[in-house]
């Protein structure tokens, strides 16, 4: 199911997807990427994504999205890759509460919130497990409207190999610290 609606640049809306059975799907990465004109998404909150390992670029460059459905209860326990997840969602002011997502297996968070330049705050992702993450490059790069971040000082960054431009172009003064420096 990866890239199923990818590059539908003029698509403004989608039909009801709530009844889609994706319980055996392992990759939904890029499903809505490059849907530049998509304003909102149908309800996908009840999707069973327990077997999904890849959601990279799921909403990548959905420039016109002004809100997202509630994806807070998704079972993310098998996901390994969230890079480019919300990349370029320039009009999103807030995100669903993804604070309880299971991030134990995630290795790549790079560019996840890149250029979400209307976001004022993020859900409390301070309890995300990051001990398997190896890349957080540009994770918050271009989030120029952020006035605060959750306390990510408890993130375990000991295995991170790539971390350049994490807060690049975050214009507001953010008080930042991490648990360890590798």
Positions of predicted regions on the chain:
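Negatively charged
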Residues: 1-182
């Amino acid at each position: 199911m990866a890239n199923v609606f990818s590059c539908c640049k003029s698509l403004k809306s989608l039909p009801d997807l709530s009844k889609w059975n994706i319980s055996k799907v392992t990759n939904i990465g890029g499903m809505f990427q490059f849907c530049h004109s998509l304003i909102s998404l149908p309800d996908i909150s009840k999707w069973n994504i327990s077997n999904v390992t890849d959601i990279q670029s799921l909403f990548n460059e959905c420039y016109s999205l002004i809100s997202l459905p509630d994806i807070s209860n998704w079972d993310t326990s098998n996901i390994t890759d969230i890079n480019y997840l919300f990349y370029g969602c320039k009009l999103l002011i807030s995100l669903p509460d993804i604070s309880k997502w299971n991030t134990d297996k995630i290795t790549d968070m790079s560019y996840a919130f890149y250029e979400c330049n209307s976001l004022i705050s993020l859900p409390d992702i301070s309890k995300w497990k990051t001990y398997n993450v190896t890349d957080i490059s540009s994770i918050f790069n271009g989030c120029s409207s952020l006035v605060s971040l959750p306390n990510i000082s408890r993130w375990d960054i000991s295995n991170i190999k790539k971390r350049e431009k994490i807060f690049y172009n975050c214009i507001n003064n953010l008080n930042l610290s991490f648990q360890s420096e590798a």
